UniProtKB/Swiss-Prot annotation:
The lineage of its organism: Viruses, Duplodnaviria, Heunggongvirae, Uroviricota, Caudoviricetes. It comes from the Viruses. This is Major structural protein ORF14. Residues 287-307 form a coiled coil. It comes from Helicobacter pylori bacteriophage KHP30. Pfam families: Phage_capsid_3. Keywords: Coiled coil. InterPro entries: ORF017-like.
Amino acid sequence: MLEKLNNINFNNISNNLNLGIEVGREIQNASWIKSPFFSITGTGADRGVRLFSVASQQPFRPRIKAQLSGSGVSGNTDFEANYDNLEILSQTIYPDAFGNSLRSKIKAYSELERIDFIKESVDSLTTWMNEERDKRIVASLTNDFTNYLYTQTMNVATIRKAIFHARNGLKGDNSKAFPIKPIRATMQSVGNVMVQNTSYIILLDSYQANQLKADSEFKELRKLYAFAGEDKGMLYSGLLGVIDNCPVIDAGVWNKFNVGMPNSSISDSDFMRYLNKANVSSIVTPRQFKEKLNQEKDEKKRSINKEISIGCLIGASAVLLAGSKETRFYIDETVDAGRKSLVGVDCLLGVSKARYQSTDGVVTPYDNQDYAVIGLVSDME
């Protein structure tokens, strides 16, 4: 992923700004390739993680149009008898600068060691940038759900219910919401008929993934995959399977060394570190979410005694990411009176779960609601 860096002469990099720009670009590209969100990220409205380019830390306001809901007119009725409303929805994202740096040992040890330090630092900073950004995406996705489903054990039925709710605009209590747009639709020819292929992405943590594998209905699905010869393809692509045309992914478990999906055993501070308070209306950590679930269960004379695992269904524009086009790469060889080198990277980044508000004060179904996320919650076992 960083193969192009092998052709760069690092001896003169501190005196060549163009080399620094090239290294920064390679770091940014490589950090995305390592990301599980890479395949669903882009600038289009049909991407799961939607990118916006910003040049400064000024607040950025992405906008969308709400679906027209009027009944129109018919016959000889004048237009003015029933005007529709073009609702523009927006939210504010506050980009922030984030970066990291490393300092070398004294240069007197060897010039070769200095060059190796720069190369190794580039690789380590790439991995750091990837994990830092991905944890911000995951934290934004799983913070303060407005729509979620809880089950003791993750299974095919719960995932199918989430997909049904997403397609038909329902909440966990079956109240009306709005349909979630699927991620990038493709046209597929079936015989002489063109069929639109749409899908949501299901992200589960490893505990939920193992629960799903133990589900008898999922085992039957796996037999169908094997019969169709698709099981090996899914194995090598990292997919658990496909349910109702929606890929199901084992995204791993959040911990200090891994991005993964969060659970209620992680500390509040570890989760909150990846949320910019300016970009959220409220913070509900996984621990607090478990307490919220317990309060709801208490009303039904039940309680959740175990930790909870948190996954989610995501649709188009679930997460909005406003950032600078390029990652800046720095080398300072004047540290400690010129005895040491400092290597660093930084960029602008604002991450927020899509949650829009009407711009003209008219209340819409979208106001303060997760635009394209449904939480999938189960006991952590």
